[in-house]
Amino acid sequence: MKTFVLHIFIFALVAFASASRDSAKKIGSQYDNYATCLTEHSLTEDDIFSIGEVSSGQHKTNHEDTELHKNGCVMQCLLEKDGLMSGADYDEEKMREDYIKETGAQPGDQRIEALNACMHETKDMEDKCDKSLLLVACVLAAEAVLADSNEGA
């Protein structure tokens, strides 16, 4: 019994450490063109918001508008280089396909519904950088809410 409890404790600790590590990662850092987009916008990794900061909405209150815009330009660069965006326009179908591939979400999954809602919410924005950051922030916030609701279930 003690061994079983120890295994559960270790599993919980690893899960917590993994979630903490993910929230400390920088938005977009998992993508191939991350370094290229940072260079194109004369930014360093220190200039980019963390996933935790964006998913909680803290990026909006802790940073100046210029920092928000610059982070958005890096996100737009990543989306454009992956063929998900051209200028300020999304390729919604490709965005859904890539999201499903990346997350393993299945049709009817609430995460896909959240992505659709986030794309709809931001589709009429004209500034490509602000639009990109708002889209990413919307999706990350929705994923955090869904993860919290699934933990409580």
From Swiss-Prot:
Subcellular location: Secreted
Family statement drawn from the similarity comment of this UniProt entry: Belongs to the PBP/GOBP family.
CC per GO annotation: extracellular space
InterPro entries documented for this protein: PBP/GOBP, PBP_GOBP_sf, Pheromone-bd_protein_Gp-9
Family matches, as CDD domains: PBP_GOBP (cd23992)
Keyword Secreted: yes
Gene Ontology MF terms in the entry: pheromone binding
Gene that this polypeptide is encoded by: Gp-9
Signal sequence region: 1-19
Quaternary structure and interacting proteins, as annotated: Homodimer.
Record keywords: Behavior, Disulfide bond, Pheromone response, Pheromone-binding, Secreted, Signal, Transport
Protein name: Pheromone-binding protein Gp-9
